[in-house]
Amino acid sequence: MPAVSRLGDMSTGHGCFPPTDMVLTPITKTFFNNIRAGVMDSGCQFTTHSCGIVVHPQEERFVSSGASKTYIEGKQAARIGDDIGDGDAIAEGSANSFIE
């Protein structure tokens, strides 16, 4: 089972686009290791990244897939391996909290 992703966890990067961190989450009451949880939502965003002159802006870099059975504050939980809207994926998560 993959680990739950949280605010500050990193993406994998893709092609020549570097990894970046999760900088926004709409979650306000659910924490893993004292860090707010990530979820599948356009408000759960990763930092802008670029490759040469091509830029993937933050508002296009949101978690676009999540757990099918685990919900956090009504939204699908984000985990290591889940997709980010621009072709990237979540690379980091909690060291001790795992879900389907």
Predicted regions and their residues:
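Intrinsically disordered, low-complexity proline/glycine-rich segments
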Residues: 2-100
